[in-house]
Design a protein with these regions (language model features):
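Short, cysteine/histidine-rich loop/knuckle motifs that typically chelate Zn2+
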Residues: 16-19, 53
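Short, charged surface segments at domain edges that flank catalytic/cofactor-binding sites
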Residues: 1-17, 74-78
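Short coil/turn linker and secondary-structure boundary residues
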Residues: 13, 58-61
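Histidine-centered nuclease catalytic patch
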Residues: 19-49, 60-65, 69-70
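A generic secondary-structure signal for well-formed alpha-helical elements
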Residues: 54-58, 74
Length: 79
């Protein structure tokens, strides 16, 4: 998933949600764009690399809803 959304050649990248936390290709979490709670699936199209804090804070929210509610800079990744 890292390679698809960030690129195999990149070793670090900012979180897709907060756009602040630096993640490493070896240390990141997987967040659902559409939450499992809302019948989101485990396909690569529905998953994004995000930081631990965003993943835990998001809970069962959909990713875009979480980003908008928290007024996070990561919204640019979804427009």
């Amino acid at each position: 998933m890292w390679n698809r959304y960030i690129g195999e050649e990149k070793g670090t990248h900012l979180c897709f949600c907060c756009d602040r936390t630096i993640m490493s290709k070896f240390l990141f979490e997987v967040g659902h764009v559409i939450s499992v709670h809302d019948n989101g699936d485990l396909t690569i199209e529905n998953l994004r690399p995000i930081c631990s804090l965003c993943n835990k804070s998001m809970g069962v929210q959909n990713m875009v809803d979480f980003i908008k509610e928290q007024k996070l800079a990561g919204i640019k990744n979804f427009v």
